[in-house]
């Protein structure tokens, strides 16, 4: 198993410690206790970072205290993860953009947010190490095809906290368009099945962000589909 120590655990863990774990939920093991009898001599305490190791920006703890997040608006690591999620199979499903290629695009300053994928210089892409004209043509075709995706895929791709593929499908079929979702109130959102108040607030916060608004407008200009192909189940948003 791989254990993550980003949680604020009430356990004094030191580097090199042996711990007892148990299965918690479906995936993540839970650390129960440290086996002090096996602690290495001179073991050093583990300290959570106060700054991002990539961009150096301060980190903040989630409201629920479960994780630390980088506050750097232009953090390369965040951009890499955001782009990888945006193009993933459950999101916009853009084939041919693995993590190594995404990092190439970032290093070459060819992308600074997901909307830049729809304005790629494919001639320049073909000149990148390991690429070529065929790879560029295949990527261009995949990017163009993604413009026709259902709204649910775009909602998933945006990376709104707690809005995965399942919630994205419910939201898309309920509101019918991205514009309608952007204009939804807290009451509108919490009335949607499986959308609780925390998720609803995350959605409102996302759309209130100038950075998100800019991304959405750039996606609109690129003719990315903002409509759901599924029947709208709530006529209030038709």
Per-region residue spans from a language model:
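Short, well-ordered loop/turn sites that connect or cap secondary structure elements
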Residues: 12-13, 111
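DNA strand-break repair and replication-stress modules
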Residues: 79, 86, 128-238
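Short, surface-exposed secondary-structure edge patches
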Residues: 10-12, 234
